[in-house]
Amino acid sequence: MTTYDDLKALFLNCSIKYDAAQSHTRRLLARSAGIMDSQGVDVEILHVLEHEIGFGMVKDATEDGSRSRDDWPGIQRRIMDADILVIGTPIWLGMKSSVSMLVIERMYAYSGDRNEKGQYLYYGKTAGCVVTGNEDGIKACAMQILYAMAHIGYTIPPQPDCGWIGEAGPGPSYGD
């Protein structure tokens, strides 16, 4: 049996809920992470809102004095250590969360950097996404996230997205 114990996957939960335990996105991310874990992949799920992250396409928002704390450089190191990056987002008004956009902007700040071989930093890494919500837009959100990841250098495999969508409007969410 093939195992993938030489791979590391980072799942970024871009829920707009501060409490990770209340996040429906986290619950679906956990299912995807469980599949990878069962195949030997080293898996980590990070709840983005548990960290202080400055805005803008900057590597460290403390360098210009606009913020006294920015946890992004540490998150970026975790991204760089991962072979696989999965961005999880809820759908709000048919769009990905503002937290997922913040993650993409911060990653983009590194997109011009090169590794020791002269390749873009994200070269050779794979990305995917998980989308949850009670309204239409899974494919549109996935398209935006996956295009951004491809644009900065990630490889996007076939069927790189999954999602759960309930009936439009108020009602049960994924974890209910």
Where are these regions (language model features)?
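C-terminal and late-domain segments of enzyme folds
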Residues: 1-3, 155-176
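Alpha-helix boundary/capping detector
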Residues: 35, 62, 105-106, 112, ...
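Short, surface-exposed, charge-dense and proline/glycine-enriched linear segments
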Residues: 71-82, 119-122, 144-153, 170-175
